[in-house]
Curated annotation (Swiss-Prot):
A lipid is attached at residue 2 (N-myristoyl glycine). GO terms for cellular component: host cell late endosome membrane; host cell plasma membrane; host multivesicular body; membrane; viral nucleocapsid. The gene is gag. It holds the Pfam family zf-CCHC. Residues 408-455 form a coiled coil. It comes from Woolly monkey sarcoma virus (WMSV). A zinc finger (CCHC-type) spans 490-507. The record marks 128-129, 196-197, 455-456 as: Cleavage. This is Gag polyprotein. A motif (PPXY motif) lies at residues 140-143. A motif (PTAP/PSAP motif) lies at residues 119-122.
């Protein structure tokens, strides 16, 4: 150690890429600046013995973690950082010095000295028991002790200077609620990112017997991550309902784990609604919801039951409890009946029909007392799907022959055909451009036709006016020249006398007769 003055903090900063990978595996995000600030400035002020240079001492880490996770006066922004510190201490990477690893594999109660690189100090008693789960609300369940894991490698020996079995538990379920207190050499154990409260630990003891299960509780990091990444149940029930439904199927939580999930992820009012709805959905012997108090308490107890998950009866009880809890979640997610909310669910311009149908069915579940997956509700859902689809899909579906014989799946397939045949953005722009040009040409033609009609009307009106004034020829009307006044209707153009016209003028007749007499003579 004389040539190496590295501290736990400097080691983590020098290998920051590995530390960040650990955080990613734990589903949390950390930053290098805050990591250094919390370690050197924040945590030493908690008064639990955290040194500014950091430590891998589990008892000190648990003490800091207890303060960070306090309901009042806690530090939620520091949760990811202390969780990663704990993971580094419990599963140290290769770059942690051997002296630090010795302190890691020891239990917090048996840790005698400070971390490597610091002078020895008088041993201080442990502040908090190392086996306390920070988010546990009550004592561990009185489940029977799990069998020793047969898959553990027998060749792995104890660390130097350590008793063979003085600090290693017989398994993660043997008297502890922490799922990570295991030797770093145990590579056969579950990965820290996998959370399965009940896990198979070996083959059945009998040929047709049950596979033995071992208990591993949820980690605080995962509970924190679930709470942070999901909206509240009152705001969007689908998020937490889907999460718990998945957990019930894949993780097989115990009764205590279910209470922990309810306590962390839901408010008091939400928990009461969920439990009330769940007890309404307890099934009787006939498969219908029962109102018998004894059957309800037996299937969905409010107090911790004595169920052994390593027996067939206990597993069946847990299975019924989980199913009933999921039914309670779905029942509590329903709002007062409001069909107007269902009609507000419209398909988006680029939304696939299958996604739209899922949103529509979720609205039915939330705002109506009906189950849209039931056979009797298929027609109503189908009509809503057609009427609230995008205009092009709606037009296609309404033209289908024998529409009453189509199922929801058939309608979705027909809608998918229209959806996938839609033109691209470039094609749409080109089509709109051509349509605009065609509209412009039609408008020009209409304007030309209107102008032609106007000119024809003007010419026709002018000809009609000419006919009314007596000018029936194609010649232009003669207008008075040299300032001569026009003649009246009964005025003679020859003698300008009134009462006769020029062809009847007596003066003009006398002149013609005189000329004729002159020729005869």
């Amino acid at each position: 150690m004389g040539q190496n003055n590295s501290t736990p903090l400097s080691l983590t900063l020098d290998h920051w890429k590995d530390v960040r990978t650990r955080a990613h595996n734990l589903s949390v995000k950390i930053r290098k600046g805050k990591w250094q600030t919390f370690c050197s400035s924040e945590w030493p002020t908690f008064g639990v013995g955290w040194p500014p240079e950091g430590t891998f001492n589990l008892s000190v880490i648990f003490a800091v973690k207890r303060i960070v996770f306090q309901e009042t006066g806690g530090h939620p922004d520091q949760v990811p950082y202390i969780v990663v510190w704990q993971d580094l201490a419990q599963s140290p990477p290769p770059w942690v010095p051997p002296s630090a690893k010795i302190a890691v594999v020891s239990s917090p109660e048996n840790t005698r000295g400070p971390s490597a690189g610091r002078p020895s100090a008088p041993p201080r008693p442990p502040i908090y028991p190392a086996t306390d789960d920070l988010l546990l609300l009550s004592e561990p369940p009185p489940y029977p002790a799990a069998l020793p894991p047969p898959l553990a490698p027998p060749a792995v020996g104890p660390a130097p200077g350590q008793a063979p079995d003085s600090s290693d538990p017989e398994g993660p379920a043997a008297g502890t609620r922490s799922r990570r207190a295991r030797s770093p050499a145990d590579d056969s154990g579950p990965d820290s990112t996998v959370i399965l409260p009940l896990r198979a630990i070996g083959p059945p003891a009998e040929p047709n017997g049950l596979v033995p299960l071992q208990y591993w509780p949820f980690s605080s990091a995962d509970l924190y991550n679930w709470k942070s990444n999901h909206p509240s149940f009152s705001e969007n029930p689908a998020g937490l309902t889907g999460l718990l439904e998945s957990l019930m199927f894949s993780h097989q939580p115990t009764w205590d784990d279910c209470q922990q999930l309810l306590q962390i992820l839901f408010t008091t009012e939400e928990r009461e609604r969920i439990l009330l709805e769940a007890r309404k959905n307890v099934l009787g012997d006939n498969g219908a919801p029962t109102q018998l108090e004894n059957l309800i308490n037996e299937a969905f107890p409010l107090n911790r039951p004595q169920w052994d998950y390593n027996t067939a009866a206990g597993r069946e009880r847990l299975l019924v409890y989980r199913r009933t809890l999921v039914a309670g979640l779905k029942g509590a997610a329903r709002r007062p009946t409001n069909l107007a909310k269902v009609r507000e669910v419209l398909q988006g311009p680029a939304e696939p029909p299958s996604v739209f149908l899922e949103r529509l069915m979720e609205a039915y579940r939330r705002y109506t007392p009906f189950d849209p997956s039931e056979e009797g509700q298929q027609a109503a859902v189908a009509m809503a799907f057609i009427g609230q689809s995008a205009p092009d899909i709606k037009k296609k579906l309404q033209r289908l022959e024998g529409l009453q014989d189509y199922s929801l799946q058939d309608l979705v397939r027909e809608a998918e055909k229209v959806y996938h045949k839609r033109e691209t953005e470039e094609e749409r722009q080109e089509r709109e451009k051509k349509e605009a040009e065609e509209r412009e040409r039609r408008r020009d033609r209409r304007q030309e036709k209107n102008l032609t009609r106007i000119l024809a009307a003007v010419v026709s009106e002018r000809g009609s006016r000419d006919r009314q004034t007596g000018n029936l020829s194609n010649r232009a009307r003669k207008t008075p020249r040299d300032g001569r006044p026009p003649l009246d209707k009964d005025q003679c153009a020859y003698c300008k006398e009134k009462g006769h016209w020029a062809r009847e003028c007596p003066q003009k007749k006398n002149v013609r007769e005189a000329k004729v007499l002159a020729l005869d003579d």
